Amino acid sequence: MRIITGTAKGCRLKAPKGMSTRPTSDRIKESLFSILGSLVPDASVLDLFAGTGGLGLEALSRGASHAVFVDASTADIIRENAEHARLLENAEIVRREAIAFLGHLAGGERRFDLIFCDPPYHKGLWEKALVMVDRGDLLLPGGVLVVEHGGDERRLPELRALECVREVSYGHTSAIRMFRKKEALKEAGSP
């Protein structure tokens, strides 16, 4: 597990011991950031269920301006990885359950260009987080919410403001869905 490119290219990331964290593979991360492309530089990033911090740190390495990492149990690992990658200055690390943190943000002023949501699979957490981002209006216009979930977790909750614009499956193991605000899609001329 490493940072693929940017200012911290090649930096190895430390993972917590045990199987409670399932980091996004380098292959999936490379594919994801290839799709995101020009959205990353100068972006404000929220990395939910951050684990090692790999997604947010990759975004910082590629030029994102600031990243908030939220995880109840791995804040120390994230801090260590951010320090090792020399990206700590632009990182804010929150030791809190991601769903509770989203509840705290809802209705507030804070919004993000890019939100990563990569919770443990098969626990219903991605659906809860998706609905909270949707109802809490946490995504800036033109921003993207990226959700990684189990490949067999197909059912989408009802959404008001967000629409799935892309889905990529990685076998039966995992899938990534990308969401944008419906109003931003209409303004851009997308269906």
Model regions: which residues?
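Class I S-adenosyl-L-methionine-dependent methyltransferase catalytic core
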Residues: M1-P191
